């Protein structure tokens, strides 16, 4: 992916090693991590270890896939993490993901970032379909997926969790 990727209000950029302190606001938050397969980080040192694994994961992905930092365009304020990557690291489906700090929930940032990544996946990567895997009780995430044009398809088991599969297929040109 030609990072940074910019939207109207946001920048999606590669992680840096010094992001651990600000990323801890996300990875250390029980309110965020209860919606993921991972428990909250206990401290910044544990978040730094997770960040190193995240950066290594992204480095192993094909071009255009991975997990990245999300920040405000005007201030460079760190907001959270977003990504586009093969489901469970192996595919064949591709997942869009978003984990933002609770203090920035409700501002449309997750929707704006996810839309941008989905459009990038369709346009630049030639993807036919993108999914979001969401815990059934995560109404906020389900709302983001719906606002991105995704529809609920089915339940499924991924990452050791019972999740809902939301999906969007690339629009077809009609003549």
Regions found by a protein language model. Name each.
Residues 1-103, 116, 120, 124, ...:
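GNAT-family acyltransferases
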Residues 99, 112, 140:
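Short alpha-helical segment within the catalytic ATP-binding CA
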Residues 106-111:
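Glycine-rich acyl-CoA binding loop
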Residues 132-142:
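Conserved beta-strand-loop-alpha-helix junction that forms the acyl-donor binding cleft
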Residues 145:
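Conserved active-site tyrosine of GNAT-family acetyltransferases
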């Amino acid at each position: 992916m030609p990072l940074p990727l910019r939207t109207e209000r946001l920048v999606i950029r590669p992680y840096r090693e010094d992001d651990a302190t600000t990323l801890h606001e996300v990875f250390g938050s029980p309110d965020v991590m209860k919606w993921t397969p991972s428990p909250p980080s206990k401290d910044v040192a544990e978040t730094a270890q997770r960040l190193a694994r995240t950066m290594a994961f992204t480095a192993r992905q094909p071009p255009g896939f991975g997990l990245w930092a999300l920040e405000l365009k005007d201030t460079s304020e760190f907001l959270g993490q977003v990504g586009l990557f093969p489901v469970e690291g192996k595919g064949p489906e591709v997942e869009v993901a978003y984990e933002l700090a609770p203090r920035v929930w409700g501002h449309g940032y997750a929707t704006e970032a996810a839309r941008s990544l989905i459009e990038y996946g369709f346009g630049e990567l030639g993807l036919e379909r993108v999914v979001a895997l969401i815990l059934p009780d995560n109404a906020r995430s389900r709302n983001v997926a719906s606002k991105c044009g995704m529809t609920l398809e089915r339940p499924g088991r991924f990452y050791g969790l019972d999740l809902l599969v939301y999906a969007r297929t690339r629009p077809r040109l009609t003549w």
